[in-house]
Each structure stands twice: as C-alpha cells, then as structure tokens.
Amino acid sequence: MARPKKCRQLSSCVPCSLFKPNGIPSVELTHIQLAADEFEALELGDVQRLSQLDAAALMGISRQTFGYLLASARKKVATAITQGQVLRLPSKTDKDLS
C-alpha cells in the first residue's frame, strides 16, 4: 500500500491549460497530464533556478521527493515536445492537492 501524499505548498499560477502541436486537432493527439506539483517543481527548479533543497523547503517536501517531481515533469515535457503530444497543464482546482 502506498504512503499518503504530504500536503504540498504550491504558489505558481498556470498561464494556460495546454500546449499542443500547431495545426492538428487536440482530439487526434495523445495527451500527457502535468500534475500541479510537477508544474511547481519545474517553476522553482528550472525557471527560478533554486537549489533542490531550497525548492523542496518552499514546497514543504523532502529534497528527494522534489527531485522525483522535477525528473517526472521534465520527462513529460520532453516527451510531449519530441513526440508531438498535447501537454495538459494543471487547472486552478488542481492546486488544492493534499
């Protein structure tokens, strides 16, 4: 049985709901969902360039968990870009994670 998720502190605002290849209807493409905590990890680690330790402290999680989230988010973004898939971003209601 999996351990319950810790409550994570999220502050990033998502500017849009998805990214997709131009000229192809979304319904014809495979969708990849980026979770709210993965989006936050990308924002803190890659955009704000915080250390994993500092970013993890801001999110209220361990450094190792932050590393897993960042790796997962990077893989999803890279897969969507290289394979021409839709990347669905978290909605405002997804931020209420526990």
From Swiss-Prot:
Pfam families: DUF134 (PF02001). InterPro entries: UPF0251, WH-like_DNA-bd_sf. Belongs to the UPF0251 family. This is UPF0251 protein Sputcn32_0687. It comes from Shewanella putrefaciens (strain CN-32 / ATCC BAA-453).
